[in-house]
Amino acid sequence: KEKTKEKIFEKHLLKKDELVMEVETTKEEETLDDKIANDLIKKQGFFDPTLELSKFKMPNLDLLKNYGETGIKINQEELEANKNKIVETLNNYKIGISNIKATIGPTVTLYEIVPDAGIRISKIKSLEDDIALSLSALGIRIIAPIPGKGTIGIEVPNQNPTVVSMRSVITSTKFQNAEMELPIALGKTISNETFVVDLVKMPHLLMAGATGQGKSVGLNAVLTSLIFKKHPAEVKFVLVDPKKVELNIYSKIERHYLAKLPDTEEAIITDNTKVINTLNSLCIEMDNRYELLKNAMCRNIKEYNLKFKQRKLNPKDGHNYLPYIILVVDEFADLIMTAGKEVETPIARLAQLARAIGIHLIIATQRPSVNVITGIIKANFPARIAFRVASKIDSRTILDSGGADQLIGRGDMLYTQGNELTRIQCAFVDTPEVESISSFVGGQTGYSQAHLLPEYSGEENNSSIEIDPSERDSLFREAAEVIVTAQQGSASLLQRKLKLGYNRAGRIIDQMEAAGVVGPFEGSKARQVLISD
């Protein structure tokens, strides 16, 4: 058998030798642009955006405090007592439990119960206040059922909550190994896991909650996460702070991480008129970036920057490396009250379009009601954080569901990204910690100036050209006399004196500005009257 096998094999070889076929593989032709790019890579390597600040050192973890907490302390007596009270309360209402399990978090313990067959979930849900009474505890929340599990959850606050330090969150492997474009470490979940999300995938974030519940600390946690993870060449912040004291602490990092308008002294924007110009400037930047992406045939900023690093885009054609720009607004309601539509329109444009070109919005407000955040803006903020609020209505306004009214405050928050709610204890960043990070970054060599946004000149300068004197209102002369006599350029004055509607009074004021009777818009102040009585 072996011999016959060898003979067959020899015959096969002979046949193969008789018909020798050469196979020629065709190579894809290299385009001129690819050839130039490959030659440049051979000579200089890939483009490195961090090269200009190559000696820049990322902040040290020693700048963050530890608060002396090594882990969660388990109080067995408290767990047993709570379990007995939950079982007893449910038994009083003839609700039997076949299984109970406790998961201990930093501030809250989750008791997962499996009710006996035939028990209606709504019956357990209606006993929320009774369970709270029996446990003598605030902030009890019932999750019925827990998504993805066949259990009902009862969240009970711990008697001795653990402080979640920013250091413990940033040193976690989940954050350190996060392969995300813009990773944000928000804090720890009920199961004591570090909660890390990608701002690019959000793509905008809405934070809301009552005064003193942790919004500003939450903003600091977001900014600290990005400063610890991203080089100044990769991310820029536009900080809007109507309160003037919350974000002022970041002024030291102006030449590293901040972006501003040309010819403005301070990078942190506190004046409402400058906010309008900055937002419109960001819209111009957005349009410019979309034009660059269109010319480079890319769909988003990640593809574009990768192409630029591979030297496939020529800087002579206007191409350059695009950093992510993050707009942070600390108290949005104040802007809407003072500037209204002038702020709303650019914010809505940015919320709808800016995600693909790397401009992301983080807006904090006390209560995002319809008059503060319109439906168009809110629809573009699927990622929302709710700190403690006063009522169920406020909770529904933020999250479109209840729950935020049952939080216990001090950084206890609910996070949603269009699906189920996740309860998180926000990482605590103290003011001295933020100051030391800002000083560490600010003490290093930075760029010659802050990242400059495109110049924007307000439209009010062109109003004299736009309005034709023949189209003036029939009450223009009478209105001008009222304004000059009162020496107060306000539309509300015309509404009262001449019994006009708001729109007509506003149009007359614009016509007066064009005629040189009153000065330009100055936010919440009345316009200056340029003609004396």
Predicted regions mapped to residue ranges:
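Low-complexity, intrinsically disordered P/S/T-rich segments
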Residues: K1-L206, S395, D533
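P-loop NTPase catalytic phosphate-binding loop
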Residues: K55, P59, I146-T151, E155, ...
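Terminal-proximal interaction/regulatory segments of ATP-powered molecular machines
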Residues: G96, G458-D533
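Conserved short loop/turn motifs at secondary-structure junctions
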Residues: V114-A117, P368-S369, R496-G501
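Interdomain boundary/hinge elements
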Residues: I142, R388, K392, S448-Y456
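Short coil/turn segments at secondary-structure boundaries
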Residues: N295-A296, G411-M413, A450-S457, L493-K497
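AAA+ P-loop ATPase motor domain of ring mechanoenzymes
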Residues: N419-V484
